[in-house]
Amino acid sequence: MLEQMGIAAKAASYKLALLSSGEKNRVLEKIADELEAQMESILSANVQDVEQARANGLSEAMLDRLALTPARLKAIADDVRQVCNLADPVGQVIDGGLLDSGLRLERRRVPLGVVGVIYEARPNVTVDVASLCLKTGNAVILRGGKETHRTNAATVRVIQKALKACGLPEAAVQAIDNPDRSLVNEMLRMDKYIDMLIPRGGAGLHKLCREQSTIPVITGGIGVCHIFVDSSADIAPALKIIVNAKTQRPSTCNTVETLLVHQDIAERFLPALSKQMAESGVTLHGDETVMQALHGPAKLVPLKPEELDNEFLSLDLNVVVVENMDGAIAHIREHGTQHSDAILTCDMHNAARFVNEVDSAAVYVNASTRFTDGGQFGLGAEVAVSTQKLHARGPMGLEALTTYKWIGFGDGTIRA
């Protein structure tokens, strides 16, 4: 089954690569319209998925990732329209020039071909990935988690209906709707057909893909994100940033999980933090210093060492007091996932040092980690957030779904 999907996707990719920007945008507009027109069928499938997931004991954080609402689905359709408004990178000449040999050389952006995406309980990924792949002339094979297989199947049917209406092969966007996990292992070996693989899920999925895939893999999305409250931080705006980074949508990978507090500000800062977190319903996981300093009003539990590597994805926050900037940077290097980390400070020298020494895909000064997002970065819907360094890093927008080819123009030109 998968080989036939691969053959069809590869054939579709050749047709997609020839489309003009206008033709691709018309497809995306049709998809957005169909998502809204067929909203009832998608939401009905999603309700079944959510009910099944709840019966299976999924956490509230996972249920939040899984659930669609009319507002969320409308926002997904609007994200597709936003992709229409983005500049098409395909065909862009990156650089080039006339060589001494007389050969005119240019490096031009082209589609990757076929992209494979394996993801878990995130139904929005189906549309986000499909829209970005189509905009860049790529076909895509999707494998969502068993928790979302009804939602994904309904969504892909809508997308394929739009493709067919625009005269394009339905195989341009395909989904593996069989929840059998053995198919993941088979997909990881489809290097004959899939040009790049993107896993979006937990650490176990990323480890499996890195170790078993014969396809180039882009890993990331696991966010043990940190905020360091420097000794010079302005407490009031710092608290607003922390509340945003922790509570706006706790189930996302750009949510802060560990707060590092400089010891020189801890006595003034921790009581204010506890009050604010109590109002926000956040449970603090405090180190020994924090446990001694606080006695409410926020719920406070002792920090377990293994929790420093946790992606809680819930209203839980580690709080650790560090001696200085060196301690904060060392902690991030040991426990961070190179996703998103921030410093809150009024000392621009310390800010510059933090930016230079923290090796993450996104580093912020006096801002929330929640900004690490394709839409917030102006990239449109993102296909993933990469925490590796080769090919793509950070939110992966359109350019990350392209490669390039060298093109030489001659006039009977030969090598001497």
UniProtKB/Swiss-Prot annotation:
Question: Single Gene Ontology BP term?
Answer: L-proline biosynthetic process
Pathway(s) served? Amino-acid biosynthesis; L-proline biosynthesis; L-glutamate 5-semialdehyde from L-glutamate: step 2/2
Can you name one GO molecular function term for this protein? NADP binding
Reactions catalysed, as given in the entry: L-glutamate 5-semialdehyde + phosphate + NADP(+) = L-glutamyl 5-phosphate + NADPH + H(+)
User: Which InterPro entries does the record associate with it?
Assistant: Ald_DH/histidinol_DH, Ald_DH_C, Ald_DH_N, Aldehyde_DH_dom, G-glutamylP_reductase_CS, Glu-5-SA_DH, GPR_dom
- Claim: Transcription is one of the keywords in the record: no
- Subcellular location field: Cytoplasm
Keyword annotations for this protein? Amino-acid biosynthesis, Cytoplasm, NADP, Oxidoreductase, Proline biosynthesis
GO CC, sorted alphabetically, is: cytoplasm
Keyword Kinase on this protein? no
EC number, as in UniProt: 1.2.1.41
Q: Name one Pfam family in it.
A: Aldedh
Give the protein family. Belongs to the gamma-glutamyl phosphate reductase family.
Purpose of the protein? Catalyzes the NADPH-dependent reduction of L-glutamate 5-phosphate into L-glutamate 5-semialdehyde and phosphate. The product spontaneously undergoes cyclization to form 1-pyrroline-5-carboxylate.
Name the UniProt record assigns to this protein: Gamma-glutamyl phosphate reductase
What organism is the protein native to?
A: Salmonella heidelberg (strain SL476)
